[in-house]
UniProtKB/Swiss-Prot annotation:
Protein's recorded name: Polymorphic pseudokinase ROP5
All residue ranges annotated as the Protein kinase domain in the record: 234-527
Gene: ROP5
Source organism, top-level taxon: Eukaryota
UniProt-annotated binding residues for Mg(2+) 1: 393
Amino acid sequence: MATKLARLATWLVLVGCLLWRAGAVQLSPPNSRTNDLASGTPHVARGDTEAQSGTGDDSDFPQAVVEEVADMSGGRVPRVPASSTTTSASEGIFRRLVRRLRRGRGTADGAGVADETHQGPRPPLRKRLAQHFRRLRGFFGRLTPRWLSGLGRRAQRWWRGRQRPLLDPSFHGLEAGDSFMRDLLKREEELIGYCREEALKEPAAMVEAVTATVWPQNAETTVDSLLSQGERKLKLVEPLRVGDRSVVFLVRDVERLEDFALKVFTMGAENSRSELERLHEATFAAARLLGESPEEARDRRRLLLPSDAVAVQSQPPFAQLSPGQDDYAVANYLLLMPAASVDLELLFSTLDFVYVFRGDEGILALHILTAQLIRLAANLQSKGLVHGHFTPDNLFIMPDGRLMLGDVSALWKVGTRGPASSVPVTYAPREFLNASTATFTHALNAWQLGLSIYRVWCLFLPFGLVTPGIKGSWKRPSLRVPGTDSLAFGSCTPLPDFVKTLIGRFLNFDRRRRLLPLEAMETPEFLQLQNEISSSLSTGQPTAAPSVA
């Protein structure tokens, strides 16, 4: 504690000395005897002094009268008047030291006295303070902690944010781009269904075990709401996809005649009862963080919040369902949410199988996906939230064409520290690979946004990172492993320059210089992207693909 107080006192003394030095001025009135002595001509008025010195300016530095003595060669050599000695003697030691320091800053090789006679008007106090502050910052720059060195930049960014009008990245109902995506994907519904079936072949044993546990003899299952919404009778329609710890099914509420996606969790070391209870709290805490209902969050923020959490009737919630199988134990905790048509990961796998986004319509679809991804991330930033899984397998295109972000349990309040392992390793920037914990900032979502947009145009990840499910992807497991850091677009669908610029700024390895989603919406590149989409949709003529040089 004493050390900290001593450091604080030292800083205060240094700053006080600099401020006193910068503000040191003559306190006597202009026509006083003190000024007469300073000019070297006692009892002479200011005007007479100017006449003798040959100057007529109103400088705050009175010009000294210089005597001349004969040189051996016949010339004249200027000499400082004798009265200056008297003046120096009459001043205090510290005052003379300050004056000499002030004179010596702009001189070199002993030219201080000669240069002072030619000084112009004294700079204003504000400029002198700024100059001294720059000197102080340069002197103590290496001793300043990193968090303090960036304080000015953060304050400047905060002030700019207060000065400019706040952007509203929220969505307003169904937009023209959504209808275009709906019609485009509807034409490829059969192909997407085929690719979904292929993706479910490998985990078929897990899907069958979970299905038999939740729907014995393929009968309807009665579930009770954990949110006081009553009971439901759910009938299985088909499996949709498999995650690391869950299986998602398409089900029908036989009484309300509504279709939902039902997320069923498997139990294990990572899905213990306490972990599922924490997951339940985190999932429905997202609505409280947003201050919006699940319906409003889906409509305005495009966040896919669950409609309900349910448990199989007559069995304890969060416990293991019985009868079940030891290899694939199922938790009695199920999430109901609106069903999506396709997630971006499955869409990329489909495009890798048969690239259907060809021609002008395909290019327009890529433009729309790019703009919607940026707005999705900007919505999170506007609410002060960070999503740890802003990844293609967690981004869904709904039946009406809207792009939504799922798994709201991965939402963090900005500035919160959490486990770095909660971020998928191939989508983690370097600041999340150097320690066991990391601070969740908007820079994380900016990085993941850049990777997702890159995959929209290129299907695979950049920097040689491995991309499961994509033919010909690279093998680098993460940025922790040495490899290329250059951003290449040679194997991608031809990109417009403004999209390349946005991707490059999102994928800046320096997180302090990384372009954030809200800032991206103010860039000329994003405005050009929006204009391309609007003009193509309004005229009915899709935007042309960029030419390849």
